[in-house]
Amino acid sequence: MSSQPLTLQDMMAAILRFWSEQGCIIHQGYDLEVGAGTFNPATFLQALGPEPFKTAYIEPSRRPQDGRYGQHPNRLQKYHQLQVILKPVPENFLSLYLESLKVIGLNLVDHDIRFVHDDWENPTIGAWGLGWEVWLNGMEITQLTYFQAVGSKPLEAISGEITYGVERIAMYLQKKNSVYDVMWNDSLTYGDITQHAEQAWSQYNFETANTSMWLKHFEDFAAEALATLDKGLPLPAYDFVIKASHAFNMLDSRGVISVTERTRYITKIRQLARAVADKYVIWRESLGFPLLKTIPSTPTVTAKQIPHICQDEDFLLEIGSEELPAAFVPTGIQQLESLAKKLLADHNISYNNLEVLGTPRRLALRIQGLSHLTIRPEAEKKGPPLSLLFEEDGSVSSQGEQFFASHGLSISHRSALDQSSTICRVRSIKGTDYLFLVIPEERIETAAILVNELPLLIRSMRFPKKMTWDNGGVEYARPIRWLVALYGDQVLPISLGFVSSGNISWGHRQLDNRQLTIPSSKEYIDILRDACVIVSQKERRSIIEQGLQNLTGDQTVAIAPEHLIEETVFLTEHPFVICAQFNPDFCSLPKELLIAEMINHQRYFPTQNLQGEITNRFLIVCDNSPTDTIIEGNEKALAPRLTDGNFLFKQDLLTSLDSFVEKLKSVTYFDALGSLADKTARLKLHLEETYPLLPLCPKEDIDTAVHYCKADLVSAVVNEFPELQGIMGRYYLQNAALSKAAAIAVGEHLQHITLGSSVSTTGALLSILDRVDNLLSCFILGLLPTSSHDPYALRRQSLELLTLLYTTQSSVDIEDLFSRLVRHFPTTIPNTVWSPEDVLNKLCSFVWGRLKTILSSLGFAKEVIAAVLTENCPKNPLTIINSARSIQELQNTQTLETIASTHNRLKKILASLSFSVTEQIFSLITSEDMLFKQALERFKEATTSLPISSREYLLQLEDLSQSTALFLDSVRIADDDENIRNQRIALLVATQKCFGFYAWDAL
C-alpha cells in the first residue's frame, strides 16, 4: 500500500479509469432513488437480450432501513456503489478485478483476500446470479456476480457484475475507523458532506415518514407502471417500478410491513419487473438488436488424438475452476467419487485405490493402479422373431433387409444363418424362434473410455445451484478454467465447452499464483504443495483444528461448531490460524448477539472462558501468511459489526416492552389474519382453552410469556438479525425485571425442538401454543406445503409440536386440541373460503403423518411402528409412543406371540361369520361359556385403571388371549343352537375390543 492513500474521489476515479481502459462506457448514477446499482437501467435492462455491453458507473444507493442517525461507523441509508457490467464475461474476470485493486494502492501479497460464496439474489426485481463476496482481511469490499436471470428471465448472454463498496475500501486504504473520517478530497471528509444528511434522513425514515402517503405511492406507482407498459413504453414503465420499490423500502423502514406481508409486496414488484423485461426484449428485437454488431467471437476447441497406454498407470483428473462455494466442495467430492466408481464398475475397469481431493479452486480425482485395458465379454442381443425376418421360402423379407443392413450384416437367405453362427444365433422362446446377434468379446483401452465418459461425468455432477458463464453449453457450480487429465505421464484429450485438458494446473491464488506443469499423477500432491496448495482436505482440517487448540490455552476454549470448521476447510487452500481481539466493552452484549456477528457474518471462532462467558479474543482462519496487516484488518472488520450490534441493543433497551407490544398493532402477521397484536390476542385465547389440559407451569408465568412473546419482533436487533427472534425477547424481559420463567420461555419458544432439546415447562407450553396457531393459520389460508416447497416450515413445526407433547409427557388428543383452538379464528376471512371441518381433517392428517418420523428417531422397529400407527389409533402422541415402547419391550417374547396369534385367529373367525354386532350377553348355557365370560370380566376389572399403552395392559391381554384360545379350542362358535351361537359371537366381539387399536398382524 502506498504511503499516501488515495482520497475517496481519487480512488473512485482510478477505478473508473481502469475500467475505461478495458473498454467500458462510463455512465452516471440514475436520477431516481434505487436500492442498489443493479436497479440502474444500465444493468437491469442492458443485461437482457443478446446485445453485448460494458459499462462502469457510481450509483448513489438508498436503503432507508440501514440508516443509523449518522452514528454508525459504516452503516448508511445513502451510500455509493461503483458498478461494473461486463457482457459477455471475459475469461479473466477475476484477474481483472484483482488488477483493479492494485490501481488504488493495494498490494495483494500483504492481504488475506477471500472469494466467499454468495448466491446473490434481488427478489424484488427477479434478478439472481452466482458469485462471491470479496473479503479483504475479513471485510466485505466487493460483490462479484455472474448474472443468471434478470426480471425473472433466464439470460441469453451472461453478464459479469462487479460492485465495489467504495466507502469500505476507502476506510481501509485511509486506515479510518469511521466512514465519516474518510477524506473525500484533500480538505473535506465524508462526514463534512454527508453526516448531517444521514441524521436528518434517518429521523425521517424511521420516525416521521407518512406511511399512509407511502402506501398510496406504492399502489399509484405500481398502477402507473402497468398503464405505461400497456402503451408499449418499457423504459418509462421501469422508472415506476423503481419508484414502487423505493416506496416499499420506506414502508419497510417504518416497520409497518411484517415478515409475511413482505412477500406480497415483493411479489408485486417482481411481477412488474418481469413485465418490463418481457416488453424491453421485444422492443430491442424490433430494433434489430443494434448493439449485436460488436459481439466478440467465441474460441474453438481442436480435437487431439487419444494416446496409447500400454501398462497400468495412475490417473489424475483435476477440474480447475474459479472459487467454488465452501458448501459445494464436499458435495463435489462425494459426487466425483461415487460417479467415478460407478463409471469404472460399469466398464469393468480395475484399480488399486481411488480418492477425491478438493479445495476452493479444484476437485481432483486420483486413481492408483488404473488398468489400461478392460475386457468386454461376449454378449448376445435379442432380435426379432425369424418369421418377421424371412419369408416362408427362406428369402429375406423387406423388414429383414432393413434389420440386417442396420447391423452391417450380409444375409440373403435363411440358410445363411448356419454359416454365420459366430455372428447370429437362433434361440427358441416359448415356441417362437428368435434371432440373437452375438457381440464378440472385445479388449477396450481404458483411455478411450475415459475420453468419452469423463466430460459426461462432469456435466452430470449436481450442485445446489449451477450456472453458465459463456455460450459453451456447460453448467457447473462456478466457471471451469482448466482441466488436467493425466494417465501416467500422458495427457488424455478431453474437452468441456471451450476448455481442453492438458497437464497445466495453478498454484495458490495469492501465495504462488503461477502455472504448474504436472508431469504425472504421482507428483501432483507434492507439486501443488510446493505452490502453497494443500490439496488434501483432511490435512487442512488437521491444521485448523490444531491451530484452534494451540491458540486457546488452558483457560479458554474456541466456540467451534462443526459447520464452521468445515466451511473454513473449504474456504482455504493453505490455512493459517491467527488470534485477534476486540474491545472488551463489547463482552457485555448478549452472548448470542456476539456469536451471531462473529460466526454467521465473519466466519470467526469466538472464545469463551471455562464459565461459558465470551472473551474478547477471537480466532481467524486465513488463506495467506499471517501479518499484522491481516490481524489489524480483521479487527477493523469486526469492530463496526459489534458497534452496530451494541447500538441496536442499547436502542432497544431504551424502549419499553409495552411500547413494543403496542407497535405490534401496526405490523401485519398475515394480511387476512390481521396484525401481530391479533396473533398475540389469539394466543391468549389458546392459553385459556389449553391450560386446563396442559397445566405445565404456573399460570402467571405463561400469561406473561404469551403477552410479550412477539414483542422483540419490532426491536432493532431482531430487525437486523431475524435469527435472534425470541432470544432477544428473553433479554428484554430480563431487563424489564419480569418473571424469569417467562423470560426463559420467550427465549426458547422459537428454537428448533428435537428429542434431545432441553426446554423449560413454560417454554414448552408457549412453544406448543405458537406452533398450533401457526399451523392453523396456514391451513386456514390454504398455505399448504408441497412435496418440494414448505416456505412456512410446517413440517418442522408439526414435528416439534409432537415432540413437545411427548417430552412434556402431555396426554393430549391433537384432534381435540385443534378443534378447540380453531374456534378462535374469525369465521369470515377476506378472500378466503374455509370450513373448520375441512381444515381440521387436513391438518390432523398432516401433523399425524409426522409421528412416524419421531417413532423412527426413537429407534422403534418398522413392524412396531406399523402395529401402533393404525387407522383407528388414538390421536394422542404420548399414547402411541408409550404403546410402541411397550410393544418393543415385549417383542420376540411369548407374550406378543400369544396375543398376535390369538387376535388373528379371532379376527379370522369373526370374519367368517354372519352376525349383527352386539355386546349384550344373556344367560350362558355351557360351562365353557361361563368360564370364558369370567376370564373376560377378570381382564376388564384388572385393566380398569391401566392405559392401553402400558406393558401391564399387554401382560393382562396375554392372559385373556390364553383363555380365548382355550375357549376356541373347546367349543364350536357356529353352534346349531342360534341362542348359543349368538352368545358366543357376542363374547368374541367383546373380546376383540380388548385387543385395542393395534395392528397385531404387523408383528
UniProtKB/Swiss-Prot annotation:
Superkingdom in the source lineage: Bacteria
Catalytic activity: tRNA(Gly) + glycine + ATP = glycyl-tRNA(Gly) + AMP + diphosphate
Localization in the cell: Cytoplasm
Enzyme Commission number(s) from the entry: 6.1.1.14
Segments of this protein annotated with the region Glycine--tRNA ligase beta subunit: 311-1003
GO CC entries: cytosol
Stretches the record annotates as Glycine--tRNA ligase alpha subunit: 1-310
InterPro entries: aa-tRNA-synth_II/BPL/LPL, DALR_anticod-bd, Gly-tRNA-synth_bsu, Gly-tRNA-synth_heterodimer, Gly-tRNA_ligase_asu
Protein name, UniProt field: Glycine--tRNA ligase
Signal peptide: none
Pfam families assigned to the protein according to its UniProt record, in alphabetical order: DALR_1 (PF05746), tRNA-synt_2e (PF02091), tRNA_synt_2f (PF02092)
Family membership noted in the UniProt record: Belongs to the class-II aminoacyl-tRNA synthetase family.
UniProtKB keywords: Aminoacyl-tRNA synthetase, ATP-binding, Cytoplasm, Ligase, Nucleotide-binding, Protein biosynthesis
Encoding gene, per UniProt annotation: glyQS
GO molecular function: arginine-tRNA ligase activity; ATP binding; glycine-tRNA ligase activity; protein dimerization activity
Keyword Aminoacyl-tRNA synthetase: yes
Record-level GO BP terms: arginyl-tRNA aminoacylation; glycyl-tRNA aminoacylation
Enzyme class, first EC level, given as a word: ligase
Cell division found in the keyword field: no
